[in-house]
Amino acid sequence: IVQPMSHTSLDQIRDTIISELEAAGRDDIKVVTENANNDTTALSTIMQNLRSEGVDIVVPIATNTAQSAKAAFEGEDTPIIFSAVSDPTAAGLTGSDCENITGVSNNIPSDEIVKLISNFQPGYKKIGFLYTSSETNSVSTINAAKAYCDENNIAYAEASISSLSELPTAVQTLLSEGVDALYTGNDNSIASAMPTYTDAAYSS
């Protein structure tokens, strides 16, 4: 089981997989857990090591982890069972070269989320979309939200980050553009730094 970093939802997925195996009485299965700690190079190394060790099944958590597993195990028939992947098709995890790959999507209906904004921010005029540019899952979610806004004449601004060090500045940039609400979709990097995100938003 491999996760790209630690935050509540990713940790919960890992722990639930392990507890369900235990509940099923599968104590014959050796479970190895790995965490790349938000390091892309480490993630690739972890996958290559698992391939060398000859694991029977790989369970990558989140989109970039699943993509890394696919690349590392190319040419192998090792089953890859992903979880927490927002858009498997956009992530390149479906198709003829993915016959050994399956899993569970955690896609968020972006239109419904945008509709909910008015529940806690009535009369808002402009949404600020913030996402990590390297996360396919996040880009896909935000693109769907922007499409809904375009169809419904909802104004928005957007900002992307390539590292968490850019997060406070990106938040301030959106606020300076007059947004009334901030929206981030399935974004593991930003989710792992939620206190930084909220502090930047509320400090204005």
Locations of regions flagged by a protein language model:
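Extracytoplasmic/secreted envelope proteins and their assembly/folding machinery
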Residues: 14, 18, 44-47, 51, ...
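An alpha-beta-alpha
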Residues: 17, 103-152
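Short beta-strand elements in bilobed, periplasmic/extracellular small-molecule ligand-binding domains
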Residues: 18, 23-43, 100, 146-164
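Beta-alpha junction/loop-to-helix N-cap segments that form part of ligand/metal-binding clefts
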Residues: 33-95, 187-204
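Ser/Thr/Gly-rich flexible loops in soluble cytosolic domains mediating phosphotransfer, phosphorylation
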Residues: 82-110, 116
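Pocket-lining segment of extracytoplasmic ligand-binding domains
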Residues: 136-203
